[in-house]
Amino acid sequence: MIPGELLPQDGDLELNAGRPTLTVTVANTGDRPVQIGSHYHFHEVNDALRFDREATRGYRLNIAAGTAVRFEPGQERTVELVALAGDRVVYGFAGRVMGKL
């Protein structure tokens, strides 16, 4: 084995298998691009993004860890979100939750 070497099993890996998901349409109403990382609590993203914010409480983007989605000014796109796992306690971000979901 080489340090850092990955030895994956054969076949495809399904991210977030069996976790609840939600599909939302998001529009960037601002004049600057907004980029959202894979583990950011979607409910608390930039206010220039318009969508059903309350429905996204407790969800994040359903994308691979370390990646992001960018919303250009005036752009509207549909994204899939996945429920946060673990203890479902959220601190930081925009400070809108600061505790248990």
UniProtKB/Swiss-Prot annotation:
GO terms for cellular component: urease complex. Transmembrane segments: none annotated. It catalyses: urea + 2 H2O + H(+) = hydrogencarbonate + 2 NH4(+). Its EC number is 3.5.1.5. Its main location: cytoplasm. It comes from the Bacteria. Keywords: Cytoplasm, Hydrolase. It is found in: Cytoplasm. This is Urease subunit beta. It comes from Ralstonia nicotianae (strain ATCC BAA-1114 / GMI1000). The lineage of its organism: Bacteria, Pseudomonadati, Pseudomonadota, Betaproteobacteria, Burkholderiales.
